């Protein structure tokens, strides 16, 4: 494969501040893309998540990786801000947008893992849906016309899990499942216009928040397996990023449009590895160590 297969391409990574979004943005940069990184957490104004990561840091990492990173603060729940973001991309890049990645989430502090629906705070749950689903709809509504006009492009909806298996919390499950349906519906409507849309999930992702929770860093992450043995089978955000970069560089990606994909189902086809040279396969680990306790992972949607 070419070393910079996305040179000259323009991408928008919505929710690129941290975690999978950051990993995707950086790996698109490695592949040579110009990457607009958007989100609420900026050096000039933080979000209510209270984390240190910023869109400017991600853009700098894109630059360091060999791409061009451009940070634009935008709340993707605000249609006016998203419209302005897309208008800027259109003006800057002569109407070009080749890759749209929607990794907006922000639902961690709103997810209730302890209670069934009828005991949950309704306002909190609906806020989660607005952050995790409505933001994706708003972003696509304004970004898709750029792709349709050029009759090419790829939409990537980032989710958690790619099967019908229940994800452990009502609103969390509803949000992550809805993102898969967003990809499916967009694929159906975009196919006549030459634009592909798909969903993708990582396995056990070593996000900044997970590393903090386990008291480790990316450098000594294996020590986290002392607290959670399954963490030994985790994957870095770069692994997800390399999967998305491979999809974006695939001239036959339309064949995957409408599907819910996973990192573990793509590394064999595209040959990418994680940063340590391994190829984590969460589905295989589930089958080996988790199926007896939790049941089958299920077939991809």
Q: Which ranges hold each PLM region?
A:
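Catalytic loop of short-chain dehydrogenase/reductase
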Residues: 106-110, 118-124, 128, 154-192, ...
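Rossmann-fold scaffold of SDR-type NAD(P)-dependent oxidoreductases
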Residues: 14, 97-109, 132, 157-159, ...
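A short helix-coil junction within the Rossmann-fold of NAD(P)-dependent oxidoreductases
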Residues: 92-94, 107-112, 142-151, 250
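A glycine/serine/threonine-rich, flexible loop-to-helix segment
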Residues: 50-51, 115, 192, 204-230, ...
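Short-chain dehydrogenase/reductase
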Residues: 1-95, 105-116, 297, 301
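Amphipathic alpha-helical dimer-interface segment in Rossmann-like NAD(P)H-dependent oxidoreductases
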Residues: 105, 127-149, 163, 187-188
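Active-site loop of short-chain dehydrogenase/reductase
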Residues: 9, 67-68, 95-97, 146-161, ...
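C-terminal helical subdomain
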Residues: 199, 219-301
């Amino acid at each position: 494969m070419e070393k910079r297969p996305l040179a000259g391409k323009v991408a928008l990574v919505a929710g690129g501040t941290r975690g999978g979004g950051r990993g995707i943005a950086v790996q698109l940069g490695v592949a040579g893309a110009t990457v607009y990184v958007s989100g609420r957490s900026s050096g000039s104004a933080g979000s209510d998540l209270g984390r240190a990561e910023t869109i400017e840091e991600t853009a700098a990492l894109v630059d360091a990786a060999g791409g061009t990173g451009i940070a634009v603060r935008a709340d993707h729940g605000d249609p006016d801000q998203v419209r302005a973001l897309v208008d800027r991309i259109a003006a800057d890049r002569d109407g070009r947008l080749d890759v749209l990645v929607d990794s907006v989430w922000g639902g961690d502090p709103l997810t209730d893992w302890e209670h069934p629906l009828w005991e949950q705070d309704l306002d909190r749950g609906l806020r989660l849906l607005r952050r995790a689903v409505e933001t994706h709809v708003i972003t696509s509504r304004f970004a898709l016309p750029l792709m349709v006009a050029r009759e090419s492009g790829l939409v990537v909806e980032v989710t958690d899990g790619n099967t019908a298996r229940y994800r452990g919390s009502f609103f969390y499950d509803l949000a992550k499942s809805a993102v898969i349906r967003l990809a499916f519906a967009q694929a159906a409507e975009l196919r006549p216009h030459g634009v592909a849309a798909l969903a993708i999930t990582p396995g056990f992702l070593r996000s900044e928040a997970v590393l903090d929770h386990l008291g480790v860093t990316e450098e000594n992450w294996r020590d986290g397996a002392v607290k959670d043995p399954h963490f030994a089978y985790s994957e870095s955000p770069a692994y997800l990023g390399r999967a998305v970069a491979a999809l974006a560089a695939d001239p036959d990606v339309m064949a995957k449009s409408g599907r819910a994909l996973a990192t573990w189902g793509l590394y064999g086809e595209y040959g990418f590895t994680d940063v340590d040279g391994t190829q984590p396969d969460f589905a295989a680990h589930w089958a080996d160590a988790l199926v007896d306790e939790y049941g089958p992972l299920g077939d991809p949607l």
